């Protein structure tokens, strides 16, 4: 259990950890729950103190930050996340990868596989459709939603059984049902579903993923070559969180599902989330996964003040550590997001607004217009480790009369080649065009300027500088 000191936490059963030797039952005894609670406090204290909870946690300057190694960017160890997972990633809602460790290495992802199962389910089904539990689904074993052969439930209830308690039975139920919908003539609905999983992964841009079943078990009869990458997992989580139904399901701390048994009687199942970070510091959902080969895995979504990211940790050493790693990655990312004023200038216009530029009026040889931002208080949010911010100011052709508020140019801010802000420049003073007599004088002035090889209009000048990070 992970909980920040002083925050409310929910005591939930440990995720079943499948073993090649035999299945391990969920922790249900008070003693085991108490041990889990104690572990959560230890982990929370460690997070507060800024130290890893296991000796394996480490900082690697070979990790990637915004597409380059930390070494290449000159980022020191104290500005990098201290995590245990061998493979990890932080990705923004727009697909920007802020951090990666072994992010393209093909590894096992265990029950994180169910994120893709959920995606295909919501894309192919209405939530009130009814599904029936087959013998194959009821007997898959390991982590389950407690479904029995012949049980009938809605797709939504099965989806909850899939994502909240990580039910392998629910995964097979949905795979069989959706596979049959995809190809009504199929003789192997689950195989049809798995094929669709791989096709959908490719459409998402996943380049290192192979699914072989809908639940992620990778041993005994399920042993094979199934694999994915931290980057691919982030793409799946990003896609899943676009769906409101999935967002609501993974945000549920606990849930009940209603099932009609084979004998016609109704009964309910209580389920607790395996996401021990849910609701803490912006965590809005996630999916765990654990097998001997995959280690302890977790992908999650965070949203703080509208800034949404997706984190992935694969092959952490313990249940607690995967959550510590996840919290560390989220805090690292948000801790390096800074807000800067777009108008980085000490000079003011006559109206008291930030002076961004003096832009030449093309009908005059010696007049300029003071330009400010369309929103003088505008700010941009940048990631401080992504490099310096650069500024480009463009000037419009200012002919004729210019009025206060007229667009006179624009400013573009980029960081590491990525556009982070664009804003119009507007006139902050009136600028009349020349009358006929003045226009004649301008022409005479320009004649002399041509002879002397001088500029024919007042030169525009950028006053503001790029914001400092």
Which sequence ranges carry the predicted segments?
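Detector for glycine-centered tight turns/loop "hinges" at secondary-structure junctions
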Residues: 6, 29, 95-96, 150, ...
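N-terminal targeting leaders characterized by basic, low-complexity, disordered sequences
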Residues: 1-25
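Active-site-adjacent loops and short helices of periplasmic peptidoglycan-processing enzymes
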Residues: 6, 12, 55-231, 235-244
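Domain-terminus/edge residues, biased toward the C-terminal soluble/receptor-binding domains
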Residues: 224-469
């Amino acid at each position: 259990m992970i909980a920040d000191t002083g925050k409310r936490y929910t005591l939930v059963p440990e995720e079943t950890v499948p073993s090649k030797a035999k299945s391990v039952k969920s922790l249900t005894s008070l003693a085991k729950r108490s041990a889990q609670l104690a572990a959560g406090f230890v982990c929370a204290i460690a997070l507060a103190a800024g130290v890893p909870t296991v000796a394996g946690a480490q900082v690697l300057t070979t990790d990637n930050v915004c597409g380059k190694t930390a070494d290449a960017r000159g980022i020191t160890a104290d500005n990098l996340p201290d995590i245990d997972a061998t493979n990890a990633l932080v990705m923004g809602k727009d697909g920007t990868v802020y951090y990666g460790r072994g992010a393209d290495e093909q590894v096992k992802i265990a029950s994180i596989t169910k994120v893709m199962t959920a995606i295909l389910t919501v894309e192919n089904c209405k939530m009130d459709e009814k599904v029936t539990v087959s013998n194959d689904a009821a007997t898959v074993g390991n982590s389950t939603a407690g479904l029995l052969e012949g049980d009938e439930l809605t797709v939504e209830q099965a989806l909850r059984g899939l994502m909240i308690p990580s039910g392998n039975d629910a995964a097979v139920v949905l795979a069989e049902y959706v596979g049959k919908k995809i190809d009504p003539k199929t003789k192997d609905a689950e195989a049809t579903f798995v094929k669709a999983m791989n096709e959908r992964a490719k459409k998402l841009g996943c380049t290192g993923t192979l699914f072989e079943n809908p639940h992620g078990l990778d041993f005994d009869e399920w042993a094979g070559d199934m694999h994915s990458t931290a980057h691919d997992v982030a793409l799946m989580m990003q896609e899943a969180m676009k769906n409101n139904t999935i967002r609501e399901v993974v945000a549920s701390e606990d849930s009940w599902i209603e099932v009609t048994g084979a004998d016609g009687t109704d009964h309910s199942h209580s389920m607790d989330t395996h996401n021990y970070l849910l609701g803490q510091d912006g965590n809005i959902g996630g999916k765990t996964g654990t097998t001997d080969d995959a280690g302890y895995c977790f992908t999650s979504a965070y949203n703080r003040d509208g800034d949404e990211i997706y984190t992935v940790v694969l092959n952490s050493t313990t249940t607690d550590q995967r959550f510590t790693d996840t919290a560390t990655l989220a805090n690292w990312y948000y801790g390096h997001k800074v807000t800067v004023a777009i108008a980085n200038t000490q000079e003011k216009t006559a109206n008291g607004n930030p002076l961004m530029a003096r832009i030449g009026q093309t009908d005059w040889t010696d007049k300029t217009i003071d330009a400010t931002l369309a929103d003088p208080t505008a700010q941009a949010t940048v990631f401080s480790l992504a490099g310096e911010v650069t500024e480009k100011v463009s000037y419009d052709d200012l002919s004729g009369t210019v009025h206060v508020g007229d667009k006179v140019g624009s400013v573009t801010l980029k960081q590491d080649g990525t556009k982070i802000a664009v804003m119009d420049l507007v006139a902050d003073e009136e600028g009349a065009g020349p009358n006929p007599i003045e226009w004649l004088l301008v022409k005479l002035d320009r004649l002399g300027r041509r002879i002397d090889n001088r500029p024919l209009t007042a030169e525009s000048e950028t006053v503001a500088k790029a914001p400092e990070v």
